[in-house]
Amino acid sequence: MAVGGLAVAGVAIGGFVFFMTSSSTFGKTLPPTGFSAAHLESLPRQQINIQPIPRLEQEHVMERAAGHERGSMLVQYNCVEYQCEPDLVEQLTEIVLNFPEYVYLAPYPTMDAKIALAAPGRLLTLDTLDKNKIRKFITDNSNR
């Protein structure tokens, strides 16, 4: 059984139950890089969002035919579970606004990363703000 990224198993011996755990990447919450048939047929209303984008809407952002010639991209951050620099959102906003409107910025307070960038079929997670890596990811995936 997986619990919060841990594999948990119980063994009963002589009336006692012993639990074993091991770390696993299975079960992590990260932005989607594709979409399912059940995704929402809507895109975020604006490029810079102060509220989280619903998961099924995030999936539609990954759909190549979602109103853009190319697949859109998500730049998301989690300042609830991770300690963020006071100006992190401001710096991410500055980066995103230098790209076309199909690059979206939003908080994602339940993801298992401080910063995550998602494009169709691609994902980059960062523990610290790296403007060069973020710009490169967006540029490299803009024409795919």
Regions found by a protein language model. Name each.
Residues 57-105:
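Mature extracytoplasmic domains of secretory-pathway proteins
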Residues 20-63:
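Surface-exposed, low-hydrophobicity interaction/linker segments
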Residues 95-144:
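Helix-rich interaction surfaces within compact, conserved domain-sized segments
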Residues 2-18:
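Hydrophobic membrane-insertion alpha-helices, especially the h-region
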Residues 37-39, 79, 111:
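Functionally engaged cysteine thiol sites
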